[in-house]
Amino acid sequence: MTPQAFYLALEQAGFALTNHQKEQFDTYFKLLVDWNRKINLTAITEENEVYLKHFYDSVAPLLQGYIPNEPLRLLDIGAGAGFPSIPMKIMFPKLDVTIIDSLNKRIHFLQLLAKELGLEGVHFYHGRAEDFGQDKQFRGQFDLVTARAVARMQILSELTIPFLKIKGKLIALKAQAADQELEEAKKALQLLFAKVLDHQPYQLPNGDGRYITLVEKKKETPNKYPRKAGIPNKKPL
């Protein structure tokens, strides 16, 4: 997917980018490739692949209408090189974006990226979701939580739901095993007082299959969740 094809696809979906936004995506791509030589950010570095599998895939929830262009607080867990939240922020500048990532080198890259792109209302924290999820500054504070290729739904739900306000929503971007993951996560979602609102398949422009899973928080998360770092992964709910 060339940059031009990416812009055209967004325009056809009703999201015409400004020249400034196009320049931001171009700068993002160049910085990603440059920094990937220093630290391992992604295995995907060819321009057409980045625009398809990183940029387009990241903004799919916007194209599908899951996120409005409003000043909502969005938390991205394990964003790595900034996906999906930074492409979302470029498209919807009103979003207030927080990223938590366990690798400090990636946080350093994201800080530099935000500065180079001129992004405001972006915040970066180094650490584990399990620890931040028990911190009052973060727990129950977000309208939206996004996660892309972080963990299976059974684990991911415990790492993300505690951050949401009541009626806040988790938007999980998943590959083809999503149906099986949801079945495995039923108990975890019940324990966390969360409910699946939507679970939709979609295709990237090249035909690759993906899923968007939308989960709503119904009540306050029990205090014992998330459990200590590492436990959700070793002993899923």
UniProtKB/Swiss-Prot annotation:
Its EC number is 2.1.1.-. The keyword Lyase does not apply. It holds the Pfam family GidB. It is found in: Cytoplasm. GO terms for cellular component: cytosol. S-adenosyl-L-methionine binds at residues 78, 83, 129-130, 148. It is an enzyme of class 2 (transferase). One of its GO terms (molecular function) is rRNA (guanine-N7-)-methyltransferase activity. Keywords: Cytoplasm, Methyltransferase, rRNA processing, S-adenosyl-L-methionine, Transferase. InterPro entries: rRNA_ssu_MeTfrase_G (IPR003682), SAM-dependent_MTases_sf (IPR029063). Belongs to the methyltransferase superfamily. RNA methyltransferase RsmG family. Specifically methylates the N7 position of a guanine in 16S rRNA. This is Ribosomal RNA small subunit methyltransferase G. It comes from Streptococcus equi subsp. zooepidemicus (strain MGCS10565). The lineage of its organism: Bacteria, Bacillati, Bacillota, Bacilli, Lactobacillales.
